[in-house]
Amino acid sequence: MSFASEVKKELTQIAITDHEMKAELAALARMNGAISFGLGRGLTLDISTENASIARRIYSLLKRAYAVHLDLLVRKKMRLKKNNVYIVRVKQQADKILQDLGILGEGFTMIRSISDSILKDERRARAYLRGAFLAGGSLNNPATSSYHLEIFSLYEEHNAALRSLTNQFDLNAKAIERKKGHILYIKESEKISDFLKLVGATYSMLRFEDVRILKDMRNSVNRLVNCETANLNKTVGAALRQVENIKFLERTVGLDVLPDKLKEIAILRVTHQDVTLQELGEMVESGSISKSGINHRLRKIDQIADKIRNGESMTGAL
């Protein structure tokens, strides 16, 4: 089972009040519902989902809210994965239910935004977001993918209203248009965690946080290791260059041409190629020299070697 499926399963098990129930149903019916008319039978509402837990949730909420007869149908998809499609069918009072949920207006006109009557308080707003995620939400597994939560809406008006509602809770949701509809998405890990908590997926939120913290720790360690490796490579590269320059001077003009303080450091550097500058400074017989002092003397040796290579006089470098 995917992480998103586990989140949805948890959401379908949340106990809610009657007011929250209608808000959640409003999102499910608006986003997953289809309306049809038939001669002699009036309006029929079908709410479809490929998730059995969500189908049971829709069925039980409709029964509890409106006490109408419902049909539960199971169809097989003919394309791709050929999953089961569960359809909760409402034949009785479908028009009244849709009007009560703020989806159907006067004269059977569709209301594509979110009715204010559904979002009277924070608990109902949270319930609507829960229903929206159950209907069209997806969430990447934080352990194996980048952080990404999204909710699909068919209509731009609903997507805009959903984004506005989401951002009332400071979740920094963004919107984008796709070929078949509109997407609301959240990419910040902290905001995704806040969304899960907001809609009531507490256990999933804690799991998400565990993975996120561990992932962030690993990334921090990797950055630290990479930084230390880069510094080590830089140090090793500098040491190799210094030794090469000292050996070049020894072969060409001899180390005796160097001032005593530079000659001493040159001999120590060649003899102890794997030690740090600080350790090298502690080996000076006349008394310890700071890391910056050792570095200064080695740079002078590098300058002298460069002048010899270029056929220049050493005078300015001594």
Swiss-Prot record:
GO BP term, pick one: regulation of sporulation
Molecular function GO labels: DNA binding
The keyword DNA-binding appears for this protein: yes
InterPro entries: Homing_endonucl, Sporu_reg_WhiA_N_dom, Sporulation_regulator_WhiA, Sporulation_regulator_WhiA_C, WhiA_LAGLIDADG_dom
DNA bind region: 276-310
NCBIfam families documented for this protein: DNA_bind_WhiA
Protein family: Belongs to the WhiA family.
Protein name: Probable cell division protein WhiA
